[in-house]
Amino acid sequence: LKNNKKTLASIVVAYSFGGMAFFAFLSWIPEHLRRTFDWDISNAGLVFGSLLATIGSIGAVSGGKFHDLIYKKGYKDAPLRCAMIVFLILFPVMAITPIIPNSNITVVMLGVFSFVLFFQQAMSPIAIQMITPNHLRAQVVAIYFFVATFFSIGIGPSIVAIFTDFLFQDESKLNLSISLTSLICLPVSILSLYLGLKPYKRSYLKVRN
């Protein structure tokens, strides 16, 4: 584990900050649809949930195939490289979607978000398993999920509430809070993944050799 600390740190930091942005977005978008477009909250949840269940499922399968394609091309850092590409796409999508003034375009963007979000869903477990010895995989994955989940679910949604109540001090600015959370968290994730590419490749080669 000491030999892979840079690699593991890049994965944990990337997915902790990315998770904060993702769960903030997932938690508050239905309420955003209610406040901005006067949707019934149950309809907002139904529409968003349906997009996640259908288009998101397609994205999850597509993401696995994309990873395998990149890996077969010789990129040993494929899990991090694929995740970085996905985060780069999600960054503008998540920053722009909450401030779109048209509900129909917003729904289309939520469809794009659902597909791309689930596209990277399996990347972090794959990344950890590929560089961890067999007898340590369960422990390392468990620690990763504990830390990432704590930040993602425990802190992510609260950031939006804090921005709305204390920064903007206006409930109608919820959309700006969601957007700002993505603007802050996702660049950290992308940078962490980028810095982790070379250490990850070294870690992968050590395990294989």
Regions found by a protein language model. Give the residues of each.
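Extracytoplasmic gate region of multi-pass secondary transporters
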Residues: N4-G63, L117-Q121, P125, S152-V160
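Primarily residues marking transmembrane-helix entry/exit sites
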Residues: N4-V12, S103-V107, A138
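Conserved glycine-rich helix-kink/hinge and helix-boundary motifs of the Major Facilitator Superfamily
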Residues: V12, G45-L46, M84, A138-I143, ...
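A membrane-interface helix-boundary motif in multi-pass transporters
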Residues: D40, A78-R81, I162-C185
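A late C-terminal transmembrane helix in Major Facilitator Superfamily
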Residues: G59-A60, I131-F168
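Helix-to-loop junctions at the C-terminal end of transmembrane segments
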Residues: G59-Y75, T164
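C-terminal transmembrane helical hairpin of 12-TM major facilitator-type secondary transporters
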Residues: K76-S124
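Multi-pass alpha-helical transporter architecture, strongest
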Residues: F91-I100, I178-N209
